[in-house]
Amino acid sequence: MARLAAFDMDGTLLMPDHRLGDKTLSTLKRLHDRDITLTFATGRHVLEMRHLLGALSLDAFLITGNGTRIHSVEGEVLHRQDLDPDVADLVLHSTWETEASIHVFNDTGWLTGKEIPELLHAHVYSGFRYQLTDLRRIPAHSVTKICFCGDHDDLCRLRIQLNDALGNRAHLTFSAMDCLEVLPVGCNKGSALAVLSDHLGLTLQDCMAFGDAMNDREMLGSVGRGLIMGNAMPQLIAELSHLPVIGHCRNEAVSHFLTHWLDQPNLPYSPE
C-alpha cells in the first residue's frame, strides 16, 4: 500500500480546462482519510498552489517550480534550490534564435516582458497572473527557473542552443509541448520527491505518482508505482515504456484509477 501519492497538475489531475473535477476532489479526500499523504508536484508557483488548496480545502505538501521549492502542509519551506546566478544571467542577457516568449520565476511570482493573454487561460480559476517587467533588470541571484513558451519545433531548436551554451550547468526539460524550462542542476520532481519522502520517514518505494510530461519523467521512473496519463507526451511514454498508461485527464482518469485501487485492489485495472 502506497503511503505517499504525488500528482502533477496540468494534463494529469486537472481537466483540459485546468479545473479539478468533482470526482477527483472526492477521491483525493478519500486518500487523505486513508492516511495517505498527498503532495502536488507541479511547475506552477507556490503562491498559486496555496490559493488553489485553500479554495479546495485540501491539506497537502507542495513541490512547486518543478522541484525548486518544497513546502510543508503548514507552509514551511522544506527545500529550496535556485538557478546558478551565472546561468540565469547568461540566459536572460543572451540573444537566442527563437520566437518563444521568456518567463522568469522567483519567490515574488511570475515575471515576463510583454502581454500574452492566452497564457493566462491555464490560470483562470486561481486568478494567478504574470507581472510585466524588464527581464534584464531582474536580480540573477534570486531566479528559481526560466521558461520559454512557443512552438514545439522552435523550442527543440532552442534547446540545442541552450544546451551548447549551458552544458551541465542547468537541467533542461519540457513541462509541456509548448514550454521548455531551464532549472537548477539536479532539480526535478523526482529529486524533490526523494527529499520529501526522506523528511516523512518514507522511501520512494512507498510512493505512487501520476504525470503526463517530460518534467514528470524522473518522478515517475523513481517511485514504487508510476502511472502515465493517456494524454501524455509521446516522448514520456517511449522513455518509460515499462510503466502502465491510464486514461485521459478529460475523463478524470486519476480518480478512476484510484477508485479502483481503493475499492478493488486485487483485481486487474482497465482504464476503460
From Swiss-Prot:
The keyword Nuclease does not apply. Its EC number is 3.6.1.-. Mg(2+) binds at D8, D10, D212. The active site is at D8. CDD domains: HAD_Pase. InterPro entries: Cof (IPR000150), HAD-like_sf (IPR036412), HAD-SF_hydro_IIB (IPR006379), HAD_sf (IPR023214), HMP-PP_phosphatase (IPR023938). It comes from the Bacteria. It is an enzyme of class 3 (hydrolase). Keywords: Hydrolase, Magnesium, Metal-binding. GO terms for molecular function: 4-amino-5-hydroxymethyl-2-methylpyrimidine diphosphatase activity; magnesium ion binding; phosphatase activity. Pfam families: Hydrolase_3. Its cofactor is Mg(2+). Catalyzes the hydrolysis of 4-amino-2-methyl-5-hydroxymethylpyrimidine pyrophosphate (HMP-PP) to 4-amino-2-methyl-5-hydroxymethylpyrimidine phosphate (HMP-P). NCBIfam families: Cof-subfamily, HAD-SF-IIB, PRK15126.1. PANTHER family: HMP-PP PHOSPHATASE (PTHR47267:SF2), PTHR47267. Belongs to the HAD-like hydrolase superfamily. Cof family. This is HMP-PP phosphatase. The gene is cof.
